[in-house]
Structures are given as structure tokens and as C-alpha cells.
Design a protein with these regions (language model features):
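Core catalytic lobe of class I
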Residues: 2-394
Length: 394
């Protein structure tokens, strides 16, 4: 076990099952654990965390403390059930929508043509960028890769086996407590969620949906005018049109927020940038990143899907973790469930996105990561976040 302390963050390179039993009085758990998809063949992603781990998390948290945990759309049920079985109350499901996922779909038409020995017609070529490792491609000018887009005559042309991923669900759970929420908050500081500091677009009540602001996601929502404060609300008699009655009916200090608009109604966070991924990693070497996956030929037959990202390996990078979450997204989630001055635990720290976010928000942090490679990346990113936070205070 390796232990590092960076400001108000304590980081362990260890199995979380060895560290969680020694932790107590934590205010929240915000984490992105294995999804049980064997992503990119990674052994650590073979299965979702079991009841034993979530039981230890439960024991480390204060009564009323919240847990937020990402899972994959296919394995959400396998992730949420052990959390509930460990003793947590499932409070909600949050949804993060994004437009950058690639479909890991098997091209049935191409597979049928291959079985029958049929030739496929080349209908177009597309520039799929650099670093393509497999599939039907040839070298173009400037060492860029040009892929043939083909079409067959089989009745199964256009059929595949999977949809394009565009969301990740997040379990919101809470450790049970006795008595009222008010009493628990007064005693432990936990039990509620921070509505006002997570309001969206100048005052909208936070929803259980977040998005990356991409055009493909924005097109889902109807295009209505953007709404802000609806103005002063002055009620004169009894039960007003906004449900105001009693002493508050003549209070013009209350402002009410509209609920028009489109995607602006929900928290927006762009996908993880290279700057966000690699901030603080100047001293680390560039290594081959993992990610992408699949063969070009399976995905680029659909011209609309030929973005150059499908079926590709990621370019070499300093942060080699394949599932880095945006810091702004993690800051929002940390702020949502953590009381002022609280301490957040992440038993599956990865490259430290939750820790980076917690430090930026002024929270304490305890992170646990079993991979030495990712632990070193997390330490560097969190140390940089600590330096930035320290500069803000002076």
C-alpha cells in the first residue's frame, strides 16, 4: 500500500477493500467504477463492484451521505443492485448525455457477403485520420488513412448488432439514517442535496439529466426561447397562481424561474479536452493510450458514421486512462451531494478526475486506485489542481 498526501487529499495505491475498512465519517462517495464490460480487454473492468465493496463504502460514510456512481447502459442493473443490497437507499438515476460515442456494431451485411464470397461495391472513400490500426484502409497523402465505404447486395445490408452509445446512467443512493432529514443535517451535515449551488442557467432547478452540449444532443430537445427569471411574484388573495398562500402571498421578494428553453434547461458540460486530461502531467512520458477499438470495416460502411473516430486507437497521450470524465461534470456532481467542507471518497479513482474536481471545489478527498500507472497520473493531476486552488486563495 502506498499513501500520498496532497493538501487536503489523501491518495492510496491499493485495493479499495484494504483501505475502506479504516475510513470513517466521510460525507459523500462520487465514483466511476468498472462497468463490467471488459472494456478494451481490461481485467479491472471484468465485473461491477460487489456487495462486499459497497458495504465497506456504506460503513465509511456518515448517516445520510450520498453515493453517486457511474455505470454502463448495459450493466446499470448489475451495478445498482449490489449498492441497494449493501444497505443504500436508491434515490434517483441521473443521466449524462453525450454525442461522441461510437457504435460497436457488427456489420451483418458485410459478414454475410464474406461468407458467400460476394464482392462489395466501393461507393465512397473517407479520410479517417491518423493512427488507424485495422480494417479496410490504405495510406493517403501525409500518412493519413483513407477507408473504402462499401455496399453489398445482401438482404441484410444495413443491419447491425448494436446502437450508438449516447448516455451513461449514474446511481444516486443515500445511506439510511434515523429521524428527520433536518435533524440528521444538523447532526452530521449530510442527507440533503445542494439545490441552489447546482441551479442551471441562472436559476433552474437541477434535473437528473446532464449533457455535453454537442449538436447531436441539442437536436433532441425542442427549440423554444431561452427562459430566465419570470419576475416579481406578487399575490393578493388566498392561493395564488403560483401556489403561494399565507404570509408569503404579498411578498414581492420571491422570484420564479421559467422552465422554457431547450437543452439549456439542463447542466451542460463539454466532453473531456486534452488540456483537462493532461493538466499537470508535464513530467510524465507520452505512452500509447487505450480506447477506441473495433475494426474500421465494421463501422464505416455507413457514411454518416465516418467521423474518423470509429474503430480507431487513440493517439499516444500522457493520460492513458480510457474513461476520463470531464472535470466540470465531476465538480457539479461533487457539489451536488457534498456539504461545505466535506470529504469525498472515490474507491475507484482511476486518473483522478473526482479528486481533481473535489480539490477545485474546496472539498477534502480520499482516493483509492490499485493501478500504479493510473495512481501516478492521478497524483500529478490532483497536485496541479491543488496548486491552482492555492493560487485562487491568494
Amino acid at each position: 500500500m502506498i499513501k500520498e498526501t496532497i493538501g487536503n487529499a489523501t491518495l492510496y495505491c491499493a485495493d479499495c477493500r484494504d483501505v475502506l475498512p479504516i475510513l470513517t465519517d466521510l460525507d459523500a462517495c462520487v465514483t466511476d467504477p468498472p462497468y463490467g464490460l471488459s472494456f478494451m480487454g481490461k481485467a479491472w473492468d471484468y465485473d461491477v463492484p460487489g456487495v462486499d465493496i459497497w458495504t465497506e463504502v456504506l460503513g465509511a460514510l456518515k448517516p445520510g451521505a450520498h453515493l453517486l456512481s457511474f455505470f454502463g447502459s448495459r450493466t446499470y442493473h448489475r451495478g445498482a443492485i449490489p449498492i441497494e443490497d449493501a444497505g443504500f437507499e436508491i434515490r434517483d438515476q441521473l443521466m449524462w448525455l453525450y454525442g461522441s460515442g461510437f457504435p460497436k456494431s457488427h456489420n451483418i451485411g458485410k459478414a454475410v457477403d464474406k461468407l458467400h464470397g460476394n464482392e462489395r461495391e466501393v461507393v465512397a472513400t473517407v479520410d479517417v485520420g491518423h493512427d488507424m490500426r485495422s480494417g479496410n484502409y490504405k495510406t493517403g497523402s501525409g500518412n493519413r488513412m483513407i477507408a473504402d465505404v462499401t455496399k453489398g447486395a445482401s438482404e441484410y445490408e444495413g443491419w447491425g448488432t448494436a446502437l450508438k452509445p449516447a448516455h451513461e446512467p449514474i446511481v444516486m443512493a443515500r445511506k439510511p439514517f434515523t429521524g428527520s432529514v433536518a435533524n440528521n443535517v444538523l447532526e452530521y451535515g449530510t442527507g440533503g442535496i445542494n439545490i441552489d449551488e447546482c441551479r442551471v442557467d441562472g436559476g433552474r432547478f437541477p434535473a437528473n439529466l446532464m449533457h455535453d452540449g454537442s449538436e447531436v444532443v441539442g437536436d433532441i430537445f425542442p427549440k423554444n426561447k431561452k427562459s430566465g427569471v419570470m419576475g416579481d411574484n406578487k399575490q393578493y388573495k388566498g392561493f395564488g397562481k403560483h401556489g403561494i398562500y399565507g404570509q408569503a402571498k404579498d411578498d414581492i421578494s420571491h422570484k420564479f424561474y421559467g422552465d422554457e428553453g431547450s437543452a439549456s434547461r439542463y447542466f451542460y458540460c463539454a466532453k473531456t479536452s486534452k488540456k483537462d486530461r493532461d493538466e499537470g502531467l508535464d513530467a510524465l512520458a507520452i505512452n500509447q493510450a487505450t480506447g477506441g477499438g473495433g475494426g474500421i470495416g465494421d463501422y464505416l460502411d455507413d457514411v454518416n458514421s465516418a467521423s474518423g473516430k470509429y474503430g480507431s486507437e487513440k493517439a499516444p497521450a500522457k493520460n492513458t486512462h480510457p474513461t476520463v470524465k470531464p472535470t466540470d461534470l465531476m465538480r457539479y456532481l461533487c457539489r451536488l451531494v457534498t456539504p461545505k467542507g466535506g470529504v469525498i471518497v472515490d474507491p475507484f479513482m482511476g486518473s483522478g478526475s473526482t479528486g481533481k474536481a473535489a480539490v477545485a471545489e474546496g472539498f477534502g478527498f480520499v482516493g483509492i486506485e490499485m493501478s500504479q500507472e493510473y495512481f501516478d497520473i492521478a497524483c500529478a493531476r490532483i497536485e496541479q489542481a491543488h496548486k491552482i486552488k492555492a493560487q485562487e486563495l491568494f
